[in-house]
Amino acid sequence: MLFSISVLAQTKLDSLLPVRGFCIDAPRPAGLDSFIHFIDSELAPRKVNTLVVQIEYHFQFQTHPELTDSFALSKADVRKIVSACKKNNIRVIPQINLLGHQSWANRTGKLLKVYPQFDETPDIKMPVIYAWPNSDNLYCRSYCPLYPELHQVLFAVIDELCDAFESNAFHAGMDEVFFIGYDKCPRCGGRDKAELFAGEVTTIHDHLVLKGREMWIWGDRLLDGKTTGLGEWEASFNNTYRAIDMIPKDLVICDWHYDRA
């Protein structure tokens, strides 16, 4: 009888909240045991069933070892995370921030450090001391979505990461993209920013679909920051919001806000 009630309660919860998700940065290898304990003791009892892990380049890539960042999880480390998630019926989804968030403050991210030719705004220099606002409107750097060799690199690391996590989905980030369609970019300059954003979403989506995987993204670039009053972080001030009508309809859009959910 108790088992029947438990199953009924779980079924009702699944119907009301089919995705009960949590997003967190990747642990350092030294903190892996604590991370596993967190899954077992905090996420599982709260009935979390989806875990997005922001890996970025903190993985020991074999396809592109040059992209492995300062602290990096091994395949064996990832297997422990996957095992803990399976045990607790949690779907685990790895994330690498694509398009935007290729830098933070005065530090360039791993992709553009290794492949500076991918930079959308190479003429804008990183400040010694970062401050916002600034004359360059530099929040975070972006890669150029039209650079010829870009996706060959991205697809290799995405596939390797998803394989390691045994995941049927990938979170591409794509939030807070300020630099897109930069006037001085020989490939993107003068192009419609919404079309560029939609084109990059579609390119990544189509690759994932070929691999049998679902694409997840953050939703802020698909909201009009001016009409909604949400501002330029939680929504778009550079007209990418029109991409909502141009992107595939079978991807998952994660709506986030600083003060509202």
Please annotate each region the language model reported.
Residues Q10-L17, A26:
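Contiguous, structured surface segment used for ligand recognition
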Residues C254-H257:
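Catalytic beta/alpha-barrel core
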Residues M1-K12:
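Bacterial Sec-dependent N-terminal signal peptides
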Residues C23-L251:
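Aromatic-lined carbohydrate-binding surfaces of glycoside hydrolases
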Residues A261:
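Flexible, acidic glycine-rich loops studded with aromatic residues
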Residues V19-G21:
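Transmembrane beta-strand segments of Gram-negative outer membrane beta-barrel proteins
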